[in-house]
């Protein structure tokens, strides 16, 4: 076991603070509409230029092990805020730094860290309650555009995200992909899409676009492998008599069965497209059931005692249109019973709440979106690779911010909500005494910090701006982009309540942990041994 180095008391806390400051000072230059960028070196490829707090925080490792621990504590604040709210990571870092700085001053002057911690916690509870009271519900597309524009620092991106949210509703999935061109565009996929295409290219109906479009088809959904035509012959005969088209979703269609379907398609006897079932294992069963509910059909499975040879038309699904491409299948306007679809959506929502695995949650959300509203894809375009990565990060932040805003509402942006919470905190401070009061005062001072930093990044005197906002009526804040004092809601400068709340809670949690530290243990770096001298015959 390697030897350890140990620091105590003030020396330990100061080492941690140096690390906190190195990380926070790097991150906070990005705050606000006039925040600058940070360039990150990459082992491979061009450096990455970013404006995103958590991405910068994750890149920072310091040489001194004690300082590095301090930096990692604040990094945890940024990534926790990012995980919960998806945005507000820089604000959280600035708040944590301010609380740690003020707290350490008071501890050095003899305050008791454990009682300070109590005061900090009480103060944060009051501030969070006050932020919730200020919160307004998101009303319509305009509010969403504001939230996304502020988060991404770009009006174009704001409009794009708002369009996407409007099209696919709150339950829909919005994915961000890299575009082949320099344009940033929005594509909406209506209906249910899954990533399986036609089994044979002979099944296409439009050879120019290489896709098969079936209008008003029957849909056979099964988890079996179909290899002999005898299995589905009775069903095919019924469909030919009706003069209808057929989509087969099965584990696989091969051999004689596939050959017969292709020959019939080429002769014009029966228009049929076969695709493999999406997903694997239990997830496949669940997705087939989703498709069945969406289209009003049944999954033909031996587990349910159903045999392919005895399938009736009433057990098949229906849809207004099915579009099958080389790698995707889209079912538009399935004929399922709306009440059953609703029940299925509720069941998936419950599973999302209960699951502990991020991977499972993501897959469940995809299933939910496919049932509920469809999928929007934002194709991000830029002139260079570096710009593309930076733009993609900003769009992802904007998406997270809009989802958070829809969940818990919006508050005045630009650090104004935190300043507006100070009067409520002052009432609490009056009722506290001793070090508990000092703890609450630490939070009070920290609440000014995000606005001060936004003003300083805009090249102005932070303290002057903070005092002016304090004297202004509630809801009036500083528009750093145009350098004027405005009603933040009217000007469309808003932050999601969830983002502001999470930032202050996580910052206080990390600050309280660091302030109550009395000793720090780190591994002693091993001295490199000199390599042995080479033997004479090696030359």
Swiss-Prot record:
It is an enzyme of class 5 (isomerase). ATP binds at residues 30-33, 87-91, 414, 479-481, 495. Its EC number is 5.6.1.7. Disulfide bonds: none annotated. It comes from the Bacteria. The keyword ATP-binding applies. SUPFAM superfamilies: GroEL apical domain-like, GroEL equatorial domain-like, GroEL-intermediate domain like. Keywords: ATP-binding, Chaperone, Cytoplasm, Isomerase, Nucleotide-binding. GO terms for cellular component: cytoplasm. GO terms for molecular function: ATP binding; ATP-dependent protein folding chaperone; isomerase activity; unfolded protein binding. It catalyses: ATP + H2O + a folded polypeptide = ADP + phosphate + an unfolded polypeptide. GO terms for biological process: protein refolding. Transmembrane segments: none annotated. It is found in: Cytoplasm. Belongs to the chaperonin (HSP60) family. Together with its co-chaperonin GroES, plays an essential role in assisting protein folding. The GroEL-GroES system forms a nano-cage that allows encapsulation of the non-native substrate proteins and provides a physical environment optimized to promote and accelerate protein folding. Forms a cylinder of 14 subunits composed of two heptameric rings stacked back-to-back. Interacts with the co-chaperonin GroES. This is Chaperonin GroEL. It comes from Caldicellulosiruptor bescii (strain ATCC BAA-1888 / DSM 6725 / KCTC 15123 / Z-1320) (Anaerocellum thermophilum). The gene is groEL.
């Amino acid at each position: 076991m390697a030897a350890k180095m140990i620091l105590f008391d003030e020396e330990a806390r100061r080492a941690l603070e140096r690390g906190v400051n190195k990380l926070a000072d790097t991150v906070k230059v990005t705050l606000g509409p006039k925040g600058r960028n940070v360039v990150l070196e990459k082992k491979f490829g061009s450096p990455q230029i970013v404006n995103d707090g958590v991405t910068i925080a994750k890149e920072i490792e310091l040489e001194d092990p004690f300082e590095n621990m301090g930096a990692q504590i604040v990094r945890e604040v940024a990534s926790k805020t990012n995980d919960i709210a998806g945005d507000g990571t820089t604000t959280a870092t600035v708040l944590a730094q301010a609380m740690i700085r003020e707290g350490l001053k008071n501890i050095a002057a003899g305050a008791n860290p454990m009682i300070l911690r109590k005061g900090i916690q009480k103060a944060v509870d009051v501030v969070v309650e006050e932020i919730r009271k200020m919160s307004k519900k998101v009303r319509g597309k305009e509010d969403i555009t504001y939230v996304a524009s502020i988060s991404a620092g770009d009006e174009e991106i704001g409009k794009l995200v708002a369009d996407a949210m409007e099209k696919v509703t709150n339950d829909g999935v919005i994915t961000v992909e890299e575009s082949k061109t320099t344009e940033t565009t929005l594509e909406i996929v209506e209906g249910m899409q899954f990533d399986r295409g036609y089994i044979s290219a002979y099944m296409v109906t439009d050879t120019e676009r290489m896709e098969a479009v079936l209008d008003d088809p029957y849909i056979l959904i099964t988890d079996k492998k179909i290899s002999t035509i005898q299995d589905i012959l009775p069903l095919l005969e019924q469909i030919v008599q009706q003069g209808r088209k057929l989509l087969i979703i099965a584990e696989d269609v091969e051999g004689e069965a596939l050959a017969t379907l292709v020959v019939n398609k080429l002769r014009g006897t029966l228009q049929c497209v076969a695709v493999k079932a999406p997903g694997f294992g239990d997830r496949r069963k669940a997705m087939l059931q989703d498709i069945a509910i969406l289209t009003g059909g049944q999954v033909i499975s031996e587990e349910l005692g159903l045999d392919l040879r005895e399938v009736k038309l009433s057990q098949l699904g229906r849809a207004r249109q099915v579009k099958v491409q080389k790698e995707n299948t889209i079912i538009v306007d399935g004929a399922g019973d709306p009440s059953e679809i609703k029940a299925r959506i509720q069941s998936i929502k419950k599973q999302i709440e209960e699951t502990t695995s991020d991977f499972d949650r993501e897959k469940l959300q995809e299933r939910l979106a496919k049932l509920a509203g469809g999928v929007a894809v934002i194709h991000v375009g830029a002139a260079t690779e570096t710009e593309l990565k930076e733009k993609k990060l900003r769009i992802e932040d904007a998406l997270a911010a809009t989802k958070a805003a829809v969940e818990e509402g919006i508050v005045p942006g630009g650090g104004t909500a935190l300043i507006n919470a100070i009067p409520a905190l002052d009432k609490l401070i009056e009722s506290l005494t001793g070090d508990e009061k000092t703890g609450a005062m630490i939070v009070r001072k920290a609440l000014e910090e995000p606005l001060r930093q936004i003003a300083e990044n805009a090249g102005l005197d932070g303290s002057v701006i903070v005092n002016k906002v304090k004297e202004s009526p509630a809801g009036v804040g500083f528009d750093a982009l145009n350098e004027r004092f405005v009603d933040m809601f009217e000007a469309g400068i808003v932050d999601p309540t969830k983002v502001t709340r999470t930032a202050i809670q996580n910052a206080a949690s990390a600050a309280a942990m660091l302030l109550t530290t009395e000793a720090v243990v780190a591994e002693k770096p091993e001295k490199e041994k000199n390599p042995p001298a080479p033997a004479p015959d090696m030359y």
